[in-house]
Amino acid sequence: MLLAIPSKGRLLDPTLKLLEAIGMRLLASDERALVVPTSWRDVNVIRARPEDIPYIVESGKVWAGVTGHDYVVESGASVVEALELGFGRGRLVVAVPKSSGIKTVDELPPGTRVATKFVNIAYNYFAELGKRVRVVRVTGSVEILPQLGIADAILDVMATGTTLEVHGLVPIATVLETSARLIVHPSYVNHELTKKLTTFIQGYYAAQGKKMIFLNVPASRLEKVLAVLPAMEAPSVTPLAKGDVYEVFSVVPEDELPDIVIRLKEAGAKDIVVTPIEKLIS
């Protein structure tokens, strides 16, 4: 089965980090290789431009892929957004030169030239507003075009706004919010491999900011110790061979850990061990 991932751009590194975190290691380091085997024996990775991935998944030749919500909308491809992946967040905005004095889209004059690689989104957005603009298709960086006199405005993804500011541009409207998504061909939504992948990704994110804590507790102190633990469900309690001592373990928020450990010691807990959680699957 083939999984499409970005070959370049802002989504590449976070995607590789996520795959590594769920145990799907790429088994070839040559970045020129377009099809790469992985440590998941039933999955090979195919590298592609993020804007092409919705079309590739829609074809059915590739079961799933990682790309931006903006690219999914732009493509109009018939794919299912199975998961929001928590990275690559930004806003698709209309921006104009600060010197123009324009504050809103309503102030754009008829015939305004809007440079963008999101041509379909641009046409639909301005058509819904009843604005007559000229869309200038661009495949690379668009921020410089107003300075060159090639465009009067741009429609592009803004993460922090720094790039716009450097080029003397200000956003005047948000077209849509975007982030990285796991997309799946409709016929594979309920496939076992899709369930496996989504389960491991969700488990990885669920484990973020949490630690596993183990401790021994005398029977006489058990009730006080359990009252300290903010378990997701309930702490697990196991009697040890000695009979008057229990082993207790639980999941706790990492930012609350220092305070919890002190309170556990005061309540009578001993032999406290804290470990990281790789994945938390419920």
Curated annotation (Swiss-Prot):
GO biological process: L-histidine biosynthetic process
A Pfam family: HisG
Enzyme class: transferase
Keyword Translocase: no
SUPFAM superfamilies (UniProt xref): GlnB-like, Periplasmic binding protein-like II
Location of the protein in the cell: Cytoplasm
GO cellular component: a single term: cytoplasm
Main location: cytoplasm
Similarity comment: Belongs to the ATP phosphoribosyltransferase family. Long subfamily.
Purpose: Catalyzes the condensation of ATP and 5-phosphoribose 1-diphosphate to form N'-(5'-phosphoribosyl)-ATP (PR-ATP). Has a crucial role in the pathway because the rate of histidine biosynthesis seems to be controlled primarily by regulation of HisG enzymatic activity.
Protein name: ATP phosphoribosyltransferase
Native source organism of the sequence: Pyrobaculum calidifontis (strain DSM 21063 / JCM 11548 / VA1)
Organism ancestry: Archaea, Thermoproteota, Thermoprotei, Thermoproteales, Thermoproteaceae
